[in-house]
């Protein structure tokens, strides 16, 4: 059986994701589609709209065969670390190809750029440092470095191009025998906040239109599969809310206000004295959005600051980051009958343990952080919903489609 991997967040699963999934099957001839999916917190440093289990259900309903979790230690990281963890996990399940969506749509451009990076890494890094010393953000410094190298025609202001390049770099750096492939995104840009197409919209615009309430679900219904709509309805009916940063702000405020600056300096991503600014601005900030606007600078992008805030919320330290640099297990979140057949075919040969019960992971540093992330994710619920969500983390077996 030919397995093809995709790297996803599905926040939420929408028609653009369905197009990517169907095109991946068509273009690769895959017998089995394996999705490695971020857990309850995402790469841009924000809580997922609904839990990993609800999003797994969306994925399986749409035709994904196997869903595995990208642990927090890789999911809430820079593009390079995110890609490294995801590619390693897909390789551990013997994926022959990975297929990602991009604004560019030309895989040759990604491969050429990744090769250039490996050949000229020292020069690239030197250019990045020069730009950083001028006070610009890392994404802009990185884009400027590529421009100076005259190394690529990729538009690195586009998030999916950045992630796609990171996937290909990870494959080449690790010398992993996976063939990368890309499908051009259609109709909507990743950052689009409005609807400009009758059936395709970005996840950003869908979350904005939803406004954290089921009352606006019909507004986004044309842009999502019926199974996604049903899952969102069920989640809201069960828990009474969708997850947004504002709901977590009181917990973040408590963490920052009661922590010493020395303690904040131990948190992953807290560098260059940003802890002073965090402590200074948190006191008067009435909302998460107001807090972010008060601490944002040219050097510190919104995304970078959101990741720092998420790490503070989940107490992810620099020391823990050092202990969690490569995946140590494959956590199965769900599978179809076809996915089950594939796993039966390969499970005796897997280089990492395939985990269906997290009780087997209680001493694993990567899972210890995952557990803290689950506690943080559930914190906004009243009882008994909070306890029920935490039980999901420990007791839910892989979902079957």
From Swiss-Prot:
What cellular component GO annotations does this protein have? cytoplasm
The protein's GO terms of the molecular function aspect are: ATP binding; ligase activity, forming carbon-nitrogen bonds; tRNA binding
What reaction gets catalysed by this protein?
cytidine(34) in elongator tRNA(Met) + acetate + ATP = N(4)-acetylcytidine(34) in elongator tRNA(Met) + AMP + diphosphate
- The positions annotated for binding ATP are 7-20, 101, 160, 185-186
Q: So what EC number does this one have?
A: 6.3.4.-
Subcellular location field: Cytoplasm
What superkingdom heads the lineage? Bacteria
What PANTHER family has UniProt attached to this entry?
TRNA(MET) CYTIDINE ACETATE LIGASE
Q: What does this protein do?
A: Catalyzes the formation of N(4)-acetylcytidine (ac(4)C) at the wobble position of elongator tRNA(Met), using acetate and ATP as substrates. First activates an acetate ion to form acetyladenylate (Ac-AMP) and then transfers the acetyl group to tRNA to form ac(4)C34.
The UniProt family comment states:
Belongs to the TmcAL family.
Listed name of the protein = tRNA(Met) cytidine acetate ligase
Which organism's genome codes for this protein? Geobacillus sp. (strain WCH70)
What gene name does this entry carry? Answer: tmcAL
